[in-house]
Amino acid sequence: MLLQSLFAWALAIGPCIAQNSTNSTWPIHNNGLTTQVEWDHYSLMVDGQRFFLWSGEFHYWRIPVPELWVDVLQKVKAAGFNTFAIYTHWYFHNPNPNTLDFENAAHNFTKIFDLAKELGMFVVFRPGPYVNAESNAGAFPLWLTTGAYGALRNNDERYTEAWTPFWEKVASIVAPYQFTNGGNVLTYQIENELGSQWRGTPSNKVPNLSSVEYMEALEASARAHGITIPFQANDPNLNSDSWSKDFYDGYGSVDIYGMDSYPACWTCNLTECDSTNGAYKAFNVIDYYDHFEAISPTQPSFLPEFQGGSFNPWGGPEGGCPENSPADFANLFYRNNVGQRVTAMSLYMIYGGTNWGWLAAPVVATSYDYSSPISENRMINDKYAETKLFGHFLRVAKDLTKTDRIGTGKTASTNPNVVYSEIRNPDTNAAFYVTIHKESTVGTREEFYINANTSKGAFKIPQKAASIVLNGFQSKIIVTDFNFGSHSLLYSTAEVLSHSIVDDQDILALWMPTGEAGEFVVTGAKSGSVSSCGGCSSVGFYPQGDDLLVTISQSKGISVLTFDDGLRVLVMDRSFAYEFWVPVLTADPFSPANETVFVQGPSLVRSAAYSSDGSTLDLTGDNNGTSTQIQVFPPKSVSKVTWNGQVITTEKTDYDSLIGSLTGPALDSLTLPTISGWKANDSLPERLPTYDDSWWVAADHMNTSNPTKPETLPVLYIDDYGYHVGNHLWRGRFEGSASGVYLSVTGGRAFGYSAWLNGEFIGSYLGAAYPDTGKLTLSFSNVTVNSNSTNILLVLQDNSGHDETSEALNPRGINNATLISSSTKNFTSWKVTGTAGKPDTAIDPVRGILSEGGLYAERLGWHLPDFDDSEWSSASPSNVSSSAGVTFYRTTVSLAIPTGLDVAISFTLKASPSNAALRVLLFVNGYQYGRFSPWIGNQVEFPVPPGILNYDGDNVIGLSVWRQEEGDESMGVNVGWKVTEAFASSFEPIFDAAYLQPGWTDERLQYA
């Protein structure tokens, strides 16, 4: 559509935007390649069926065990999501310009598409090539960060040549799994938060051709390699107005526009978000409605990334900041988005995972828990449960997919402190009143009524029950003319949870906060009764013409109401709703109500299926505690229920449910063996002048492509020499005397470095949470300087990763190395080493290029299974050497977790003293799964999943301890582990993970 005609059309219909719209008002779009996925002002449409895209993000490369992906995705599905989103990771798959790896272990992500099909979920595929994601250089391959490929994320031919092989291969891999080819991949994102379509003010529409041509090239390449599904984009904020065809049809604009938002800040350091969100106020909602109406009025309002939590930066609070986006955040903000007509939303993150190895950007440490609904250890939490209530509602609220906003900011009757937005389906007249505090940052208890318009007139509701309550940072969606199956609610002040059809009869589930009252009207019902009162009170049935008004108060428990036409209504409080599940019996992402079953009680229900004769309901899932009641609502033909393959004893109730009990493990019954039997060896022989570095790379470049030039020569930027991650070692030589050295070293936030002259320690930069450069003048006064021969300076530096976005080219290495001397300021030569393998190759293709750094222990494979440490001495990391240096500790511990249990295990690292100047790396069966810097803080627990840990077998545990200070003060690290959660589960965490844990080979010896 031409820009001029679009805006003329928009102006013509402008007054309709906040009013009911007829079916013909808004055009239906597709991309011209398929009509299977279409969209309009209201929602996406899949094969003609309107669809609320409810998604959560997870990153397969942050949980590098393919056997665990099904566990995570089953939990996503169980929470009511119909979609999940994934990023790829360019560097993970493209370790050097000549290698693409989509085959080894977790590098092969096609299993995820098979799981999506099996579970009945759509996929939003986000291949980058740049993804940000708090990943090292935003997932750029680090060989790209030298400056030789230009400024990146533009139309530079050098950059284009770099991304083309990866981009083409990804498209060809994904193409067979598209919805248009019988798969479940629904949309394909181009780039990520590239808000640079325009030069200057977006309203002037002056194209930024560098970005425009880049986007156009990415789009054309994806199409040429088989991608036919719609393209989407995610604008980074409310200000850049980039890539919407409604705003401008051309200049690289994509099919479906989206905009990302993190109203409670994407990091625990809240001040970082001030420039985007303004000064932080807890629970301060943001208006998106006007933005989408202006920028993408003929498209669904889409939030490709909406806040699911926050990452924890170096030095952040121990355990992250879940209090910034708790369960109440999910309740309030997700409902408020519905009130703004959002019909496509993906939570970032639904499961965060771990920055194992050197995946992380400098802004974040090892944990990428993100305070997500599914925790880093794969266990679900209260935010998950609250999110599930919302997800189950979305699944059955079909009329939400087409609504107009009738009004917003309306004051509730009798209480000016409560306001609501009214959205209404123009076809069915179903309405949704989304209520919040007038000041969303205020969590006071407020009682109120609303004036609701229904198909049978206007009512001040509730009519008979106690008033509606907002208690705390909460929102409620009050429905009117809510259709489910063959029934309808004229209204309900209790929130709708779910709907199922069993034996051709409707079952409706409602919920309310514990102790509150609700009122609903069942149209066409004549009478009702209480079949089971589990915490109910003040139940009343009041005929109103052809309808029946019902009042009920609900304490902890679940109550069952039965009506004259066979309708059953379950009413439960929040605590019982948290343990209420609606497994789907089909792989249809639309989850039809007649293909679901209600289950209440277990910690998790993963799947449900009926036997071929319909007499048995087979359930799988998780449960804990010594005894858990389970209640199911299956067809009358079901007389037997199995749980994880075992028949459970049940009793049939008068209202046709089956009740039984489950048994599970007591957490205190699981004990882990003590981690002991440590052996140790020196991991820094490079400090010694006798060390042979003849095989190291000569650091002799006198120029660099990097736009940031060094202060001294030669160039000592690590990426220029083919090393990129972890610890790097520089050896500089000089002749004659000097009294000291000035060093300026850059390694990213929280990095550090230490230096030795001729084998003697001269000092360290200990690092801090935010500075990325450390400048020191180190004296040689206490060490021996060879005035008549060669002196060797060793600099061991940490590299916490490359910066993101436009700062990915920021160099890592030594910016300035100047001798303090009357005769010479310069070193005669430099050499460097890092990760084992030739520069820009991966010696360990299974674990991948980001797995390990350049410490002596890593290069020689001391962290790997099968390494022979028989000649090492016994020593404990709890008391490290008094000398500054690096010591590697290693032990083997066997686990024997009982089968039938899913167990979360975390390592605990405790420094002595608590702020010891130590840099510690934790290795488990060859994987680096913890970076512990007690001087900076604050992560002390490190979850390690099965597949990395062998739950039934031996585990090689390694610990690299870099002491940055010398002296008599005792320093050490106490290493422990613990079971944090345990469930009886259908998911089996014991499997053969040998292919994920390749062992030591003598190839490593050449890197000594």
Swiss-Prot record:
SMART domains listed in its UniProt record: BetaGal_dom2
Signal peptide start and end residues: 1-18
A biological process term (GO) from this entry: galactose catabolic process
One Pfam family from the record: BetaGal_ABD2
Catalytic activity: Hydrolysis of terminal non-reducing beta-D-galactose residues in beta-D-galactosides
Location within or outside the cell: Secreted
Annotated protein name in UniProt: Probable beta-galactosidase B
Gene name, Swiss-Prot/TrEMBL: lacB
